[in-house]
Amino acid sequence: MKYILLSIIILSFTHVAIAQQSDTINKRSIIKRSILPVSLITIGSIISGSTFEKNLQTNLRNAVGNDYEFRIDDYLLFVPVAELYIADIVGAKSKNHWFDQTKYLLISNILTAGITHGLKFAVGKSRPNGGTHSFPSWHTTFAFTNATVVYNEFIDSSPALAYSGYLFSTTTGVFRMVNNKHWLSDVMVGAGIGILVTNLVY
């Protein structure tokens, strides 16, 4: 329950702060685009520390081998950023000029990093490998923040490119679990924060 309350409180403050900066935000659009990330945050918070989550992690590690480690997740989270600027270089039509893209990218990452690290220290959840500050996953938050910037920039002109960032961010989250660095709930909440905050920034 404390995970849910912390997530809701922090994200609510973020929502209010961003919403006050613009009178042109379409409230209906915000609600529609918030359904998925809020669901991820809520469900992730509910299953955090549950027997289901622990059994899932145990079964996953048994399937890949307890000594398995493939640190591709340390690199995949940057791919959406590379996609964004490569698309600009080759002349792909986007919603905003590269300068504004960079502005939204930085604002989104600063906000999501603050929220994620704030929750990490407030919650103090242990990682499946015995480490600390597990909830939520910063790698996943960062990856989904960047992927959501790509989505917002290219969804109207190039849907395939817009959705491609989520392929890399999802893979990042999966490998955080495969490498025994995070639980499912850490990944779900991290993804939800990245998507929600970035959509609010846009």
Q: What do these predicted ranges mean?
A:
Residues L84, L105-G124, A162-V174:
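Small-polar-interrupted transmembrane alpha-helices in polytopic inner-membrane proteins
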Residues L5-K93, D100-I107, L111, F121-A122:
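N-terminal targeting leaders of membrane proteins
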Residues S39-T42, T102-G118, T145-N146, M188, ...:
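Hydrophobic, lipid-facing residues on alpha-helical transmembrane segments of integral membrane proteins
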Residues T14, S48, A87, T116-G124, ...:
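Membrane-water interface at transmembrane helix exits
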